[in-house]
Amino acid sequence: MSDRPRRRRRPARVTAAVIVLPVLLAVLTGARTVPAAMTWQHLNPVELFTTIKLPALQASNRVSGVSTTVVRSTAQQVRLRLDVAPGERFFGLGERMGPLALNGQLLHNWSEDRAGRADAATSYSPTPFLLSSRGYGLLLDTTAMIQYDLRRADRVEITASTAELPVHLITGPDPAAVLQSHAKMVGLPPLPPRWGLGVWKCLIGGRDRVLADVRRLAEANVPLDAVWIYDAMDNGSGWGWPWQIHGTVPPGSYPDLPGLIEQLHGEGLAVLGYLNPFLVPGRRGFDEARERGYLVPTPAAPVFTEPWAEDDHRAYLDFTRPDAVAWWQDRVRHALGTVGFDGAMQDYGEGAPVDGIYASGQPGTVVHNAYPVRYAEAARQAAQAVKPGQTVLFARAGYSGSQASVTGRFTGDQHRSWDRHTGIGSVLPAMLSGSISGWPYWGPDIAGFFDGDGSRDVELWTRWTQLGALSPVMRDMLGAQADPIGVFSNDGTLATFAGYARLHQALMPYLHELAEQASRTGLPLIRPLWLAEPADPVAWTVEDAYLLGEDVLVAPVVTEGARSRPVYLPAGQWHDYWTGEVITGARWISARAPVQQIPLYVRTGANLALPLPATLGLPAG
């Protein structure tokens, strides 16, 4: 049947549209039911219903499939309604820092700079993909603003600010199949180079200090794969963080940046810098971009600018304008090809002005969410032209479609605190929800970025280092104040970082296998327990632990002073990494967690060669 409504009588003015999705799929652990139809109801004084048939779904095996319909409304708004079954849980919607299960929340599908905010409604990288524990996913093909209201127990209400909304219903025999179908629709993630899943150290302060720190790390036997030098300025490309670091330390001196990078390459290290999509008045490139019309204007200004970083302002490159993109890509190619960088933090991308006038002719409300996608695509294309398959551009912002252009993600700017919404407690929800949504390669800022009450807290730094080491990328961040606790604070912190770096290095062959799988299938490296055990009702409730692939279970400690924590082990036999004890799963246990140990379990029979705990050289405690 046509996806346009069959008119039985001329209705009154249509104000919105609602889709009701009744019993889309069988509950994974319950009775199998075949859905009959998708119903579209106009909200107007005349009741008008049109039934749109779904593809046949076989209850016997719940086969994979995608059913697509386009919902249209005469108003600039489409509303969808999902009926919710008892016990049904929802996940996804991009990187989120609140509870992993989205039930009970009001969320916005709008890319925003969270800047350490505590609300879960906002996201650096939202995506309009909702996964249900009943065995289906719903992907909305739009960059318009969407509100997801999951506060009611019996329904989910979705409001999209658009007159036309393609809706993709994705089904499969298990959640993994649904995630794989979604990944193939939005774009499979590219495979990063091997070093991209390694141990990175953030270094600043100029050539001499960087080289001295590299020597110190080598003397401590830290297995280093890459250094990230974000204050290394390159005027030709505009790369580098051009402001004071930590409020007191100015950008370092790099008189021969290509020479320094070549020297670090000779020591087996990849070198990353820093880029963003902005042009800053008074700095190189701004006048040329303005004269050529590459910067986004608004009705009120020939070039839109907004305050940024101390006394500076920033303007946005128009990524909908092909010649502007080509000009910007020349700068990226210069940084990678001529200067020699191997990648960069791909920062920002969330703030494209909604009143901007874009070359594509699209309104800013449509361009806003698409901006980080275009930004990522442009950077990826330039990198591939110079160093195909050899670079990592690790991004903060994203939207549906940027998954295909990003070889690394960080979780944004957390506070140095134990806070569950803005500090260390927000990291795992961000990585898990982002992984469900199609971004598999996560490396959070070890110890966070913004100042907080934990800036001098060694225990907090240690717990963050442990979580970073058991992430796809182990990378630290120096933060936003002059002297936070860090790798070089004392002999104990250096030994802790070195020990967990050795553990991460031992995991690298396994992580690379998982990354190859992700690039082929879209399955994430960091996984909720229910992805491996969808028939286990307890697994669907666990939000504070995760699986690396199928064989490693990690239970981070994110509570100050905790020396033990409950851990749910899925079915099977599990080895406690620290004690060697073999534990039968499908049950809760109480795990010991002294300060220097993160609860860590390896599935019996896993093909992993991990170092003995005693060889890590961790401090006592």
Model-assigned labels for residue ranges:
Residues L610-P611:
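An acidic, gly/pro-interrupted, aromatic-rich
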Residues R10-A31:
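Secretory targeting and sorting signals
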Residues V34-N607, L618:
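Catalytic-domain carbohydrate-binding cleft regions of carbohydrate-active enzymes
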Residues M1-R9:
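Terminal targeting segments of Actinobacterial cell-envelope proteins
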